[in-house]
Amino acid sequence: MISAEATAGFLETLWRQGQTIDALPDDLRPADTDEALAVQSAYIARYPSCGWKIGATSDGGWLAAPLRGEPLPGGASLAGNMPPAVEVEVALTLGASLLGGSTEDQARAAIRSFHLAFELFGSRYKQPKAVDASSVLADNLNNAGVIVGDARLPAEAQATEIVIEFYRDGEDAGRHHAPWPDDGFASGLIWLADYAAKRGKPLSAGDIIITGARIGPVPLQRGARYEARSSLGTLAFAT
């Protein structure tokens, strides 16, 4: 059995030094999902996190990981620390705590606002697709931070569709067009409330949750300006 604290600390040191590796050393590599989740718990206990990323799996389940650090504002420059790629997402911020075992009504009521967001997409592994799933889960599912746009109240944000356009230096870099979820993202929140409590960080007011890639991951280029536009607002950053 690995030391979850040692693995979390090793990965964090790599992040701060801007280094990548082929794979975790054998004595730090989680053997299964439970050990990877223990690494997430150790990370949350030791390092700042503004919330969670969550995404649906191909078999109808969910995956989640803590977000790294504090959110960056719109218009941020990533020139000094550019990740390899970015995803365009819908984010939400909680206005109240949400405990495990919550109902759909409680999950909906806990949402304070919706936002356009960018997930900064990076990994401590040189080839993240070449390492095992538990190692990726321990590395917080490739999260390198988040940029969050202006808030929209639920009554303002919820529409029949989510339409997003993404541009690099004014050129089309991706589009997304899909129905707004029937449950208003409640099912994912209900699952995440249980998950977060088990990791030792129950969902609370102010937590930011990004809900899965709508566009991307899109590889980033240096010296470019990226902008997303949708009914949730406009959000941009530079590299």
Language model features: what each stretch is:
Residues F185-P217:
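A conserved acidic, glycine/proline-rich C-terminal tail/linker
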